[in-house]
Every structure is written in structure tokens, then in C-alpha cells.
From Swiss-Prot:
The active site is at E271 (proton acceptor). This is Probable lipid kinase YegS. Its cofactor is Mg(2+); Ca(2+). Belongs to the diacylglycerol/lipid kinase family. YegS lipid kinase subfamily. One of its GO terms (cellular component) is plasma membrane. Residues 2-133 form the DAGKc domain. ATP binds at T40, G66, D67, G68, T69, I70, N71, E72, T95. It is found in: Cytoplasm. It comes from Salmonella gallinarum (strain 287/91 / NCTC 13346). It comes from the Bacteria. The lineage of its organism: Bacteria, Pseudomonadati, Pseudomonadota, Gammaproteobacteria, Enterobacterales. Pfam families: DAGK_cat, YegS_C.
Length: 299
């Protein structure tokens, strides 16, 4: 692998003391691969490190962390207007790793690193909300969003993605639907919803397949609505297929407009955004990402 160009790894500070990762990086460096490592401490660090990556002339910026870290790095990359932006590499180190998991990124650190450095760079889409905030994986709204934002950090650290499900079951007594109106290309729906998923990727909340047919290079976003009736069949798709469940509504569009009579919150790759009006649009081919050749998110 010594012939491959240099990379810069932007590592979430929570993973800075990961000894297996240190060993994997050392082994690659011993093979002649140049890997710069930078650790984030506060919001805005990812943007500064992407700027540094351009000055260093690296061809890949690797996001080492969970969906939030991937979001920060990818958002910084698509801001580059002059010249060719570095490709994005993925190193899943977070609690849920929903985007990396659905993309088929290896769990083994050494294999994930090699893919991030030497894999083929594919053009993929991103999405933007209200002309400002971006996401690479999914925007989720409703009860599911409240659960992911309220799940205690200690529970997430101990149990990983299943912690969201456990915390959700503990909060069933507080469950209330959100009323909203959603429009897209040739689509209009209005009613009460428990969960809204608008996906560039397929899963959120620690492995829940909210948008199971989403692709990252088709110029579309997939919508899934769980209406505010028959809670358990709607929330847990293991109990019924969506084709058999009238309380699950699917659509696909390059954009969606959402209006609510009261404030609702969307979770964008882990970052909450509250309001009553949301315009969500796809950004086709917004960045290049190193993905496995059999990546299920590619058409």
C-alpha cells in the first residue's frame, strides 16, 4: 500500500485513547502509508482540520467516529468550491455507526482503515435542510428523535445502539404523535405521525431500518412515515412488513417540505434542529466517498 497518497484522520476526541486503533495506524505507517491524525475537541475542529488537509495535499480525509463526526467532516468537505476536494473515508468508532454499517464498512479497524485509504472514491449525495444544515445519513423526527436525543450517555456507552430501543420502551407512557403536513414531488400527506424518516442512508437510532431502500447516489431521498396509530406494529418493523402495515407510508423525492402547527425537532445525523418549517433537498454527487465495491447503498 506504500504507493497510496497521504490521508488525514479526523478522530473524535472520545476515541483518542483507542489502543487497537493506534496499533492499526502504526502497522500501516510501517508499510509506508502516511497518515496524519488530528483529534477534535470542540465544534468547528473538523472544519479547521479539513482546511489543514487541503494545505497538506492529502487525497483522503477520514472521519473517525460516529454519525455526528461523519456529518461534520462531510459538511466541511462539500464547502470546498475551488479545486477538487479530498475524498471522504469512513472509520466507524461511534455508538451506533448507522451510516457506516448500512454502507458495509468493515467493523475491523485495520480493514476499515485500508478501505478508507485505498478504496474506490464514489460520488454520493448529501442532503440540506433550510438551505443551511446538511446531513449525509438521515433526518428523523417525532418520538424516535426525542428518544435518541434523551437517551443517557452512560446507557449508550454500555449498550450501544440497543440503548435507544430500551430507553424508548421505558418512555412509552409519554408517547404523543406530532401533527404535520409533508409535500414532495407528486406527494402530499397530512396527519399525525410518530416517526418521520427522510433518508439518504437507510438506518438510524442504532440499527433501525427506517428507509430500507435508500441509495446514496440516486439523486433522491426516501421518506418513511409511521402514522400515529397502532404504536408497536409501526415502531418495530420486525412485527410486520411495511407492505402489510397501513400505518407505514413510503415515498421518494428530490425534496420534501414539512410544515407543523407547533415546533417539532428533527435529528440530523445526531444534531437536533427544531422549527415548524423544513425544506429538505438532496445535493446530488456532493462529495466523493471511499466505499466497498459491494456497498448496498449504491445503485
Amino acid at each position: 500500500m506504500a504507493n497510496f497518497p497521504a490521508s488525514l484522520l479526523i478522530l473524535n476526541g472520545k476515541s483518542a485513547d483507542n489502543q487497537p486503533l493506534r496499533e492499526a495506524i502504526t502497522l500501516l505507517r510501517d508499510e509506508g502509508i502516511q497518515i496524519h491524525v488530528r483529534v477534535t475537541w470542540e465544534k468547528g475542529d473538523a472544519q479547521r482540520y479539513v482546511d489543514e488537509a487541503r494545505r497538506l495535499g492529502v487525497e483522503t480525509v477520514i472521519a473517525g467516529g460516529g454519525d455526528g463526526t461523519i456529518n461534520e467532516v462531510s459538511t466541511a468537505l462539500i464547502q470546498i468550491r475551488d479545486g477538487v476536494a479530498p475524498a471522504l473515508g469512513l472509520l466507524p468508532l461511534g455508538t451506533a455507526n448507522d451510516f457506516a454499517t448500512s454502507a458495509g464498512i468493515p467493523e475491523a479497524l485495520d480493514k476499515a482503515l485500508k478501505l478508507a485509504i485505498a478504496g474506490n472514491a464514489m460520488e454520493i449525495d448529501m442532503a440540506r435542510v433550510n438551505d443551511k444544515t446538511c446531513f449525509i445519513n438521515m433526518a428523523t423526527g417525532g418520538f424516535g428523535t426525542r428518544i435518541t436525543t434523551e437517551t443517557p450517555e452512560k446507557l449508550k456507552a454500555a449498550l450501544g445502539g440497543v440503548s435507544y430501543l430500551i430507553h424508548g420502551l421505558m418512555r412509552m407512557d409519554t408517547l404523543t404523535p406530532d401533527r404535520c403536513e409533508i409535500r414532495g414531488e407528486n406527494f402530499h400527506w397530512q396527519g399525525d405521525t410518530l416517526v418521520i424518516g427522510i433518508g439518504n442512508g437507510r438506518q438510524a437510532g442504532g440499527g433501525q431500518q427506517l428507509c430500507p431502500t435508500a441509495l446514496v447516489n440516486d439523486g433522491l431521498l426516501q421518506l418513511r412515515i409511521f402514522t400515529g396509530e397502532e404504536l408497536l406494529p409501526a415502531l418495530f418493523s420486525t412485527l410486520t412488513q411495511s407492505d402489510d402495515n397501513p400505518n407505514i407510508i413510503d415515498d421518494a423525492s428530490a425534496w420534501f417540505d414539512i410544515h407543523a402547527p407547533h415546533e417539532i425537532t428533527f435529528n440530523l445525523d445526531g444534531e437536533p434542529l427544531s422549527g415548524q418549517e423544513f425544506h429538505i433537498e438532496v445535493l446530488p454527487g456532493a462529495l466523493r466517498c471511499r466505499l466497498p465495491p459491494d456497498c448496498p447503498l449504491l445503485r
